[in-house]
């Protein structure tokens, strides 16, 4: 098994398709579905979860987890009586119903078009200037008094909190709007949403003849605190009935806690300026496109923390299997193995040795960046062709975490044995995702480790029940901490 794969390069790029099935299903007669990597054509409408979406009757409202930039979804618009002012209502994100959840806006990181917004210090809804990214920056104050952004959050019960201004029925309920179009004082509560009301005053000189895209910077932590931990995000999404799976009572919270604990462990990396630093192994930062199937979104979340999802029919619970270093939970040898041991290897033409990972970079308003990694030439098999995998980590906004996950993927690809065994019936107690060991003199194996990928009940030659297991080669070195250097975007 090789050491860490450390060659990494960064690019700016467009979108690459990614598919990863990260589920394991474990019944009394046990089945497991493993990850399958490769291109997957979209099977649902791309509703543009991070974009400012035009009005449509099939728009879905996204969910922010962690820290993210995104646009809003138009849900209402009103023209003033004098036809000089437009009011727009944008739904930005759903909010967790968990009592400890927190949602906030960082108004110092809002953008109008591609320019940074500065708000007035007295009227907190009033935009007083726009600043571009030039050096030195250009500040445009013509916008002052022409653009207002009022922010709100609403609980699941419909209790609205004004973040930086007046209540909606005050901000969008003045005499300049026809009475029938004003925001009512009750009955329009935007339950469970973060939303904004934008007031735009027409002025050709200020460039406010039409609304440009607004990019909001939001923070949503389903269990409170200052970060979104993977176990908390998974549990929230699996149990929420509005935007998630709605499976309250059917998920294993213990496995979510275990994932949080593993994710909180620190890894060491080299900052862009040199030296040494540490950060938590895994965090979730991204936007859920609720127009896509729930399982697709769960897979994308778990891909960013190198885990699987499992179902156990005996307990009736969905749980998380963490892909990490484990000790053997069951031993197979001549005393409990029945019949042949079937061994195969992954086709050399399908074994990845290059990986290109796209992720939304927190250094550039979540615009896509790439990290590219290769298996060192000395670790390739003779005549092994270049085989690149392209993948997207939608809930990773950090180059260090992206490299860490990419290194694991390349190292895991070096472990290419696939083994099928039949055992006596006690082997049925092995669960999907467990690590087991095999001792067999013919193959020269002494306590050789494998990860269990499928378990099924089988009838053996003597008519008794046994267990058939499909295994993949396991090596704990896959889970070492690679040498990683943080990426800094070019100025």
Please annotate each region the language model reported.
Residues 2-10, 18-300, 394-400:
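Polar, S/T/G-rich
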Residues 109, 306-310, 315-319, 356, ...:
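Beta-sheet entry/capping signal
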């Amino acid at each position: 098994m090789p050491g860490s794969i450390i060659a990494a390069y960064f690019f700016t790029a467009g979108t690459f398709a990614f598919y990863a099935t990260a589920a394991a299903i474990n019944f009394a007669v046990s089945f497991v579905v493993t990850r399958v990597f490769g291109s997957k054509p979209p099977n649902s409408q791309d509703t543009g979860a991070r974009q400012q979406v035009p009005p449509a009757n099939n728009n879905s409202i996204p969910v922010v987890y962690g820290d993210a930039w995104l646009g809003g979804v138009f849900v209402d618009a009103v023209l003033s009586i004098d036809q000089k002012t437009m009011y727009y209502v944008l739904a930005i994100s759903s909010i967790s119903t968990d009592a400890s959840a927190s949602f906030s806006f960082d108004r110092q990181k809002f953008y109008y078009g591609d320019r940074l917004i500065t708000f007035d210090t007295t009227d907190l809804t009033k935009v007083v200037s726009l600043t571009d990214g030039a050096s030195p920056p250009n500040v445009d104050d013509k916008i002052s008094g022409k653009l207002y952004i009022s922010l709100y959050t609403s609980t699941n019960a419909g209790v609205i909190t004004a973040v930086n201004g007046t209540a909606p029925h005050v901000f969008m309920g003045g005499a300049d709007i026809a009475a029938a179009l004003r925001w009512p004082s009750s009955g329009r509560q935007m339950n469970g949403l973060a939303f904004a009301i934008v007031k735009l005053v027409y002025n050709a000189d200020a460039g406010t003849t039409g609304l440009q895209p607004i990019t909001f910077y939001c923070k949503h932590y389903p269990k409170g605190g200052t970060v979104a931990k993977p176990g908390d995000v998974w549990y929230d999404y699996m149990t929420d009935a509005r935007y998630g799976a709605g499976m309250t009572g059917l998920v294993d919270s213990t496995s979510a806690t275990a994932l949080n604990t593993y994710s909180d462990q620190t890894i060491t990396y080299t900052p862009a300026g040199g030296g040494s630093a540490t950060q938590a192994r895994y965090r979730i930062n991204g936007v859920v496109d609720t127009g896509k199937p729930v399982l697709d979104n769960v897979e994308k979340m778990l891909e960013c923390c190198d885990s699987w999802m499992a179902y156990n029919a005996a307990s009736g619970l969905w749980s998380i299997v963490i892909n990490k270093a484990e000790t053997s939970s069951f031993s197979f040898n001549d005393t409990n193995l029945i019949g042949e041991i079937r061994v195969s290897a992954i086709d050399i033409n399908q074994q990845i040795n290059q990986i290109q990972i796209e992720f939304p970079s927190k250094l550039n308003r979540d615009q896509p960046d790439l990290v590219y990694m290769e298996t060192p030439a000395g670790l390739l098999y003779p005549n092994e062709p270049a085989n690149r995998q392209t993948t997207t980590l939608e809930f990773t906004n950090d180059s260090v975490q992206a490299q860490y996950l990419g290194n694991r993927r390349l190292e895991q690809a070096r472990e290419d044995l696939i083994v099928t065994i039949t055992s006596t019936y006690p082997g049925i107690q092995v669960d999907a995702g467990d690590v087991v060991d095999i001792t067999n003199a013919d193959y020269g194996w002494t306590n050789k480790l494998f990860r269990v990928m499928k378990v099924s009940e089988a009838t053996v030659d003597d008519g008794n029940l046994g267990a058939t297991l499909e295994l993949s080669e396991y090596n704990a070195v896959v889970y070492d901490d690679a040498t990683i250097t943080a990426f800094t975007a070019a100025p």
